[in-house]
Amino acid sequence: MSFASILSGPAEERSPPKRQSPPPETTPAPVTSTPREATQLSPPPPPHVPPSHQKVKEQEQVLPRLEKKPSSEKRRRNAEQDNKAGEPSNGILSNGIPEPTKTTTQSWSFLSPRKVLSERESETINKLMVEIDNAEKSDVEAPGFEEEYEQYKLQCKRRALHTLKEEGIKRKRRRNTFLVNLGKSLEKQASAGMDRFRIANEASVISEVQAKEIQDEKERKKDMQRKRRRENTVRLEMQKKLEAERKANKAQDSAEKAKFLREAERAQRKIKTTKRALEGVTAPEEIGEVTPLAPNLEGGTTSSFHIGRSSPSRRKSGRGGPVTRPKKSKEQKQAEKDAAEAAYAAMENDEPLPLAPKEDPRKESLKKEAKGSRSKESSPAPLSAFETKGYNQIYEQIWRDIARKDIPKVYRIKALSLSTRQENLRKTAQLASKQSRKWQERTNKSMKDTQARAKRTMREMMSFWKRNEREERDLRRLAERQEIESAKKAEAEREANRQRRKLNFLISQTELYSHFIGRKIKGAEGDSGDTAVEGSDETVQPGKDEEHAMEDAGAKVTNFEDLDFDAEDETALRQAAMANAQNAVKEAQDRARAFNDGQDHMAALDEGELNFQNPTSLGDIEISQPTMLTAKLKEYQLKGLNWLVNLYEQGINGILADEMGLGKTIQSISVMAYLAEVHNIWGPFLVIAPASTLHNWQQEITKFVPDIKVLPYWGSAKDRKILRKFWDRKHITYTKESEFHVLVTSYQLVVLDAQYFQKVKWQYMILDEAQAIKSSQSSRWKNLLGFSCRNRLLLTGTPIQNNMQELWALLHFIMPTLFDSHDEFSEWFSKDIESHAQSNTKLNEDQLKRLHMILKPFMLRRVKKHVQQELGDKVEKDVFCDLTYRQRAYYTNLRNRVSIMDLIEKAAVGDEADSTTLMNLVMQFRKVCNHPDLFERAETKSPFSVAHFAETASFVREGQNVDVGYSTRNLIEYPLPRLLCGSDGRVDVAGPGNLHAGFRGKYLAHLMNIFAPENIKHSAEHDGTFSFLRFVDTSINEAYEQSHQGIFERAVRRRGKPNRLSRLNVVYDDDKATMASALPHTMFNIVQRNDQHAINDVTTEGYMRELTTVAQSAFERKGLGIIEPCVSPAASAPPITVSSSSRAPLSEMNDSLFNVSVRHALFSTPSKQLEQQILEKKLDPIPYSLPPMLPQPISIKGRYTHIEVPSMRRFVTDSGKLAKLDELLRELKAGGHRVLLYFQMTRMIDLMEEYLTYRNYKYCRLDGSTKLEDRRDTVADFQQRPEIFVFLLSTRAGGLGINLTAADTVIFYDSDWNPTIDSQAMDRAHRLGQTRQVTVYRLITRGTIEERIRKRALQKEEVQRVVISGGAAGGVDFNTRNRESRTKDIAMWLADDEQAELIEQKEKEALDRGEVFGASKGGKKAAQKRKRDITLDDMYHEVSFAIH
């Protein structure tokens, strides 16, 4: 074939398979491929155009298309090929190539029909063909295509083999599918057939089985009855045997002894036969009767008493011949009697009668032979007659002897036999009649007995099958439970290994991240590292420069969810951890650069900024103190500044966890000063702190860095809106001249105004007291994480407070990418480190070491005793107090009302409501320990007052001073007529209604009055009535005035008169006669001359005063006046008032009640005007300061009223803590100390204020209710005013950030659950600036819940020491605490020592039995209902605590 013919007729020359076949499914191997590669079967790649077709295409592109009509021969050949192609095939062509489909054939572009060529194009093609034909060698015929042809054949074979293989796989798949479907169909049919068969035959089978079971049960009972009968037979026969042997031993006659021995032998044979039947050996005969003979119901016979044996007549051969009765021996007769008795006893017991067994034919034959022999022997021989006289005499003598001896004897025997026979017949008749009646009586009874037996049988059968089914069910459940437990154990082991690999991956990832950060910093400084990051399984050594190279940024990053933690080989996990760590470092650096470049798309948050490098390995670059910082940094503070600067330059977040009081604030301020001075970065900086420290931050920034401007962002919503105008603006450039550089605000305000803070790109965000974000689920944590900031710095003195979960929250906040949503890491922090629930202690120690390696790089912590030598020591003392009687009664009553066992069982269930109830109980016990008045205050008591008090609608309109004098009046009023109360009822009072008042006044009051001056004068001149006036030093006018004065006015006048006579009598000490002669006009003034009050006034000391005031001095000396009155009246009432319709009595009563002179005389209260006049006129105040006429009350406590006010002394002694605190404060006050007094409850602070007021101690107070603007002034007052002795604070509000170095004593009235909260509170005084030793007193009530809480707090402190300080874990018993036992531990706090010991003993016994003590059936369901894990700290501070 020539090349021209190929070009002229490509369609005709192309073979049908080539035209119909699709392009090959596999890519042809290159020319240099090996035979192994050629023969390898691979999945078919996308189709491609063969090289030959490609050449044809190229030629078609070069040559114009020409249409050449095929010749007739070619046309015929094409038709044959078309017919062959149109025949149906089985999918395989002749050359072994799969037949192409229609769609595949139509997809080839070069098989499409060609267009018609022009004549010029046809001529050109023909010329070219002629040239090709005339050439020396054709391209087709010339060699050079052998290799392509071989390759083509190889591809065809490979396609054929592949097609065959695919068809085989498809056939196998179809066969498997068909078999599966067929199996399912057959299974359905079989199941349906089984159901039909069960439905059809289930009832019959059940009935048949039940019938068989009933029959089996009957047979079993019959066997049991037969067995009991045989055992009874053995017992009776054994008794008979023993009795026979005993009789044989006692018998004297040999025949009788032989008889008894035969009976014993017979009984032995029967015993042997019965035992053989019991043992299962088939006896030749059934033992069914007592004797081998049948029972004789007719009685005994006398045939045995014949002298001679008469042979019975032989039976005739005929069936109906007469039968003679055989003779019976004594043994047979006795046997018949015994049989009769046995039959009678059987009938009495309703037992079946024993029937005599049939004798063997052999025995019958033997009996017959014996009878025949006896008959033969008994026939006597004929005797010859012999008669003699002696014979006859002997014969007669014999008959006489017979008649005398034998006949009576025989008669007696015969009569006895007859009577015996009659008696037996009578008994037999009675038995027969009784038995006949029994059949009639037993008809219904037997039916009832049958029913009862059937019911009892059914019950027994049901109980048996139920018991059997229960046992089988228990065994099946036990097997299933064991199988499930083994499967759970295996699954738990697999899951534990998987979790361990997850944890190793996470820890290795963080360790490698820390290692890469350290290498990069050291590489930048030109210092080769020599430290190693040690893990539990591998050790990463820096080594050579090409190891762990950071330039390998193209390493594949694997998601945590895509990792295979089930594989045993951990090489892939280590490689993935290394790649992820490298990628995290690169992302952190890129984001830091992007933030500095101001790219908007990277301004969201640098969540990948992490740092795990130890501050000592961050390099040896020494950074000097900024010049704009006015304070002088200490050495350790300068080191902290270097660490913070390196963190910022690398874009890494960190935790500054120095102990409280070492200057975390000044170090943070120095970082901002460094950035402003060196890098010209003036902000904006964001400082978030607790509300109590906001003023402190503002003051210290202004004080130490005056060039940095602070914007205090707090106040009301309106104030904050005005402040936002300074910073809530776009495109603000922060320079030295900016309006502000640092914004200081609180956590609460950040959450409220989070939408405004998120708009600003903060250069540095500093969180003071970062334990405020210890919960990663809180809105505060999420809002702060969403802020756009370049770096974050957390300041905290206590990174671990209650548990390790809080430390993990801080780590999650500063590096959320590596730790985000990793529950395994969280569980490791909160479970394995804190509780060590696993038994593998070595694994826990390795994890603890790796935790230290993770914490060291990015957390800097220094302790005071290591860095600050000039700071005074801190001494902690636990002061134990005892419960008072009232506290002990309250505590015992509370504990008796609570069941400790019930609480522990509820704690094992773990319901949230039960946990809250338990915490409320703990709060009640703590209240009792603090002060019983927290439950019930001692109220003010007073008698029931039957009176009416003044009322007012509002005190506002009453003014500043409300006058309520004499506002109390009796509810009883005595009404009087107007005539009596008015002037009309008075005789001497003139008025419109009294026309005779002048007459009566003139005559009655003057003329007829004996005290008239004229009458007194006339009577005193001689020895009249008033002649004594000259001896009593009284004039006429004085007597007249006293007659017109009342008794009260006379007493007041007598009180104002000086006691001159008695004083003179005391001073001169003269005789009475001499004094009387010296002063005759006072002769009759005996009382004034001998008044003892003058002696008391003159002699103020010495024995004379004691002798004159014996009663008063004894009363005062014994303290009777200060004793509280033991009895108070039940009711009290003011005097009954008089009422009238007239106003006259009201005016008169007011004149009497509000008389100034009377009130002054009674109470001796001089007015301000009188005191001013005495001072101005320089008068002697003694006459104007006379003692009150109203005597002093006997009781100083009660005074003039019966109102009982609670005693403050009792208030102090009712609480053991307060009594101990009273002694302690007295000593501290005398020593010149100043005290910080911390409380957990604000109500206790209220009570403490009353106590301090009672003791006159000056104090100030700060708790959660103190306003923000007042806190700064309160702290400043305590710091600047030394007279303030006590500062009352709540541990939560007053324990954060404030500086109280003026105090050198800290007292915790009640301790916090969290020991770090107390540590923060005591460091308010023990911090920089404190030059004295700080003493910390902690009041603990002995033997109560507070002592157990303190022990738990010490364990928490040990956890912090182990994790943060890197100490050994030997001091903490981690194995005794897990997540489920926290609530149970709280319940154990409520128990006393005896109850706790009993509960621990029961727990030990439960563990020995393999049970869980206190667990109930609903425990798992209740545990699943818990929505969240409530910590002790959260539940404790929900109940009336000081709010932070």
UniProtKB/Swiss-Prot annotation:
EC? 3.6.4.-
What are the residue boundaries of the Helicase C-terminal domain, all occurrences included? 1220-1380
Binding annotation for ATP: D658, E659, M660, G661, L662, G663, K664, T665
The Helicase ATP-binding domain covers which part of the protein? 645-817
Motif (DEAQ box) positions are 768-771
Molecular function GO labels: ATP binding; ATP hydrolysis activity; ATP-dependent chromatin remodeler activity; DNA binding; histone binding
Q: Which UniProt keywords apply?
A: Activator, ATP-binding, Coiled coil, DNA damage, DNA repair, DNA-binding, Hydrolase, Nucleotide-binding, Nucleus, Transcription, Transcription regulation
Q: Which reaction does it catalyse?
A: ATP + H2O = ADP + phosphate + H(+)
Gene3D superfamilies xref list: P-loop containing nucleotide triphosphate hydrolases, Tandem AAA-ATPase domain
* Polar residues composition bias: residue spans: 29-41, 101-110
- Please state where this protein is localized: Nucleus
Coiled-coil ranges (or none): 207-283, 440-511
Q: Which GO terms describe its biological process?
A: CENP-A containing chromatin assembly; DNA repair; positive regulation of transcription by RNA polymerase II; regulation of TOR signaling; subtelomeric heterochromatin formation; telomere maintenance via recombination; transcription by RNA polymerase II
Is DNA repair found in the keyword set?
Answer: yes
Q: Name one GO cellular component term.
A: chromosome, telomeric region
The DBINO domain extends over 398-523
Enzymatic class: hydrolase
Cite the record's Basic and acidic residues compositional bias ranges: 55-85, 329-340, 357-377, 438-452
Q: Which family does it belong to?
A: Belongs to the SNF2/RAD54 helicase family.
Q: What is known of its domains?
A: The DBINO region is involved in binding to DNA.
Quaternary organization: Component of the INO80 chromatin-remodeling complex.
In Swiss-Prot or TrEMBL terms, this protein is called Chromatin-remodeling ATPase INO80
Gene name, per UniProt, is ino80
